[in-house]
Amino acid sequence: MNFEIYTRSGCPYCTKVKQVLQGKNLSFSEKQLNAHFTREEFYQKFGAGSTFPQVLKGSVKLGGCTETVRYLRENNLI
């Protein structure tokens, strides 16, 4: 099960969602603002006003930290 996390530096929720996934040995790749994508590309992908982090599981958009943790709980992954 692979997750893709869109992050920015200095984001505590980005750190938290990565810690949750790492704590359960769930694999993920990280894409960082300005290193892998621009803010404009981020808004095109997730919608204007979207916040960090944004998490995908395959092509499914899970949302931010809270939504991702909810998804993991509902699917008995944490």
Ranges and model annotations:
Residues 1-26:
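Local sequence-structure signature of Cys/Sec-based thiol-disulfide redox active-site neighborhoods
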Residues 12, 37, 63:
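Short alpha-helical
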Residues 15, 40, 70:
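Alpha-helical elements of the RecA-like P-loop NTPase motor core of helicases
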Residues 25-30, 61:
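Conserved beta-strand scaffold positions in the cores of enzyme catalytic domains, especially
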Residues 32-49:
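Thioredoxin-like thiol-disulfide oxidoreductase module
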Residues 46-56, 65-66:
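Structural micro-motif
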Residues 57-78:
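Non-catalytic, surface beta->alpha helical segment in thiol-disulfide oxidoreductase systems
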